[in-house]
Amino acid sequence: MLQVYLVRHGETQWNAERRIQGQSDSPLTAKGEQQAMQVGERARSLSITHIISSDLGRTKRTAEIIAQACGCDITFDSRLRELDMGVLEKRQIDSLTEEEEGWRRQLVNGTQDGRIPGGESMQELSDRVHAALASCLELPQGSRPLLVSHGIALGCLVSTILGLPAWAERRLRLRNCSISRIDYQESQWLASGWVVETAGDVSHLDAPALDELQR
C-alpha cells in the first residue's frame, strides 16, 4: 500500500487580505511560516521519503520548511499548481463586480462548464493534479511521499477520488497547512485504487485558521 500525504501551503499575505491568488503569488505570513514548521514537526514522525511541491512561491517556501524538518529533497511539479483564476487573480474578493462574483461563484456552486475568463476549468485542474498523483506510483517500493499544493487543487483531488465530478460544489474545507492522506491499495472492502484515509487534519496546528477568524 502506498500512502501519500497532501499538505496545503501556509497562510499567505493575500489569504489574509482576502485576495484571489490562483497562479499568481504572495509570500507566507509569519503565521504561515509557523504553520509550515508545525507540519514539519508532524512530518518527522511520518517517515516521509519524498516531498513533491507545486512550483509556485508559497508552496515552494512551505515545502522548504517541511524538508528542513524531515531531511528530504524536494521535487517541483507544475501540475500541482493552483487553479488558474484568469482575470480575477490578484483581486480582493470584496471588490468584485456582480458579474465577476458570478464567475467566481460558478466554481464554488458546481457549474459543469464554469470557468473564469482567461482561466481554466475544474476538469482541466483535475486532469493535471491526478496526473501528478499518478507519478507517485512510479516511486521506489516503500516510498512515502508528501505533496505540497493548494486549496482548490487538493480539494478537487480529494473530492474526485471520492467519486464526485471535478466541478461539484465545493464542500470540503482544507485549511492552510492542513494534512490529508490518501492510499493506493487493493481492498476487499473498498474500491481498488486511491482511497481517502483522512482529509483536512489540523490537529498539529496551535492557532485558529483564517477562515475561522474571518467568519
Swiss-Prot record:
The record marks H150 as: Transition state stabilizer. It holds the Pfam family His_Phos_1. Substrate binds at residues 8-15, 21-22, 58, 60, 82-85, 104-105, 151-152. Its EC number is 5.4.2.-. The active site is at H9 (tele-phosphohistidine intermediate), E82 (proton donor/acceptor). Pathway: Carbohydrate degradation; glycolysis; pyruvate from D-glyceraldehyde 3-phosphate: step 3/5. It comes from the Bacteria. GO terms for cellular component: cytoplasm. Keywords: Glycolysis, Isomerase. It is an enzyme of class 5 (isomerase). SMART domains: PGAM. It catalyses: (2R)-2-phosphoglycerate = (2R)-3-phosphoglycerate. One of its GO terms (biological process) is glycolytic process. One of its GO terms (molecular function) is phosphatase activity. Signal peptide: none annotated. Transmembrane segments: none annotated. InterPro entries: His_Pase_superF_clade-1 (IPR013078), His_PPase_superfam (IPR029033), PG/BPGM_mutase_AS (IPR001345), PGM_Phosphatase (IPR050275), Phosphoglycerate_mutase_GpmB (IPR023086). Belongs to the phosphoglycerate mutase family. GpmB subfamily. NCBIfam families: PRK03482.1. This is Probable phosphoglycerate mutase GpmB. It comes from Salmonella choleraesuis (strain SC-B67). The gene is gpmB.
